[in-house]
Amino acid sequence: MLDVSRHFMPLPVIYRTLDGMAAVKLNVFHWHLTDDQGFRIESKRFPLLTAKGSDGLFYTQDQVRDVIAYASARGIRVVPEFDIPGHVTSWLVGMPQLGSVQRPYEISRTFGIWDGALDPTRDSTYKFLDAFIGEMGALFPDDYLHFGGDESNGADWKANPSIVAFMQSHNMKSTDELQTYFSIRLLELVHQHHKQMVGWDEILTPGTPKDAVIQSWRGVESLAVAAKQGNRGILSAPYYLDGMKTAESMYLDDPIPDNTTLTPDQQKLILGGEVCMWAEQITAQTVDSRVWPRTAALAERFWSPRQTRDVPDMYRRLAIESIRLDSLGLTHISGPESGLRQLAGSEAAASQLAILISTLSPVSFSDRYQQQKTSQLTPMSNAVDYTRPDPPLREDLRLLVNPYLHSATPSDYATAHRQLQILFQSWIASGPALDALAPEHPKLNQLTLRRSQIVQLGKLGMQSLASIESHTLPSTTWIEAQNKLLKTSADHSELTDFVILPPLQQLVDLTAKH
């Protein structure tokens, strides 16, 4: 799933995403086309939707047809999502008469859950939806249409006396029951246009029709409820890429876990997993580094038995696959490299910055939002935007330290020692080099603490190697100081996390055994 509403993604992003999907055999492109921040698809029946709800950033129907044809040629289905009845601010800017509360609407620049919602009690709402579904159903040939259904808080429904009266007259005790009513009527319209409906967890209630497909962002427990109720389902909760989790942690989450409570027949209702890339904190320049290569690992998870769990071998192959994806034109490597050159001002300076950046990963979406209060207008061209989730050094450093932890040949041990020395020395040198550049390139000051810490961590590494090689026990004071450094370096700082700390901790621990 690619969200193109929060930040619009130009067509080249769409095409190269499809190229990457084809390369790793992902076969459904879920296109999140509407949300509070933008209505991104042309409607000829209702042109005000894009005229006032898109900032002029949307796909024409001819462009959509081209994307569908491009995807189809690569064995990929395209399933559009039109998120209703909530997350509809961009719809209501041009068509406020569809709203539950009549007021002026503006495109949301910030992110969250807003009160605006379609009025589910008026026949005019369903007349509009009938026409809209007919138009979009004809444009998208796939059997499925996704209508969201998530995070409608019910506030505007409760604020409208006529809606409250409708609920009372229909013996509805909560807005959840009103949403079920809406979902049932919506599903009837979808069926009339010979389509099937997909929605998020929120559309699932005891009254939800069995042929609605549930996509779960809440987790395996929620998905299990759907399956036990007889609904087909798709798991997405563990595969939200904006959580910035490692490929390892996501790879180990199977859509049907070992401890599932589902019967064999109920397990057949789980259609699989779906990777989700939400766009609150990405742009066209950074999206690929958030999606790839981690998504390749998830593609393998979805196509493999749950017993496939060899993480080191997965990383070995993922490194190779990452280079192959780069050769296909994906920008998960070249995009951050370009960004670092913009920050540092020259290729030579960027090479020094890259040393520091290679040790860092961005904090999760929620952590960044809490610290920065990101919005649609927040610049996404800062140091954190050019860090990569689960960067290669995380696994590479683990492999380099392994000969110190396990029996290794003298040759392997010597090679690891030499490479670790080179790495640690590069960390020590990068800090002063970046300090010298910072006055002329102020964005480097976004990583002031990390610049200092990487020097200290490099010295920790060199001193640990020296102690281990000489079989000399370091002082208790030294060990305490290094453990304190590792602990403070593990804190979220400057919107980043170090990915190098566990192997360094292992080296410090080893010094006490010699």
Which residues does each predicted region cover?
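Substrate-binding cleft of carbohydrate-active enzyme catalytic domains
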Residues: M1-K195
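Substrate-binding groove of N-acetylhexosamine-processing glycoside hydrolases
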Residues: R122-Y144, A165-H514
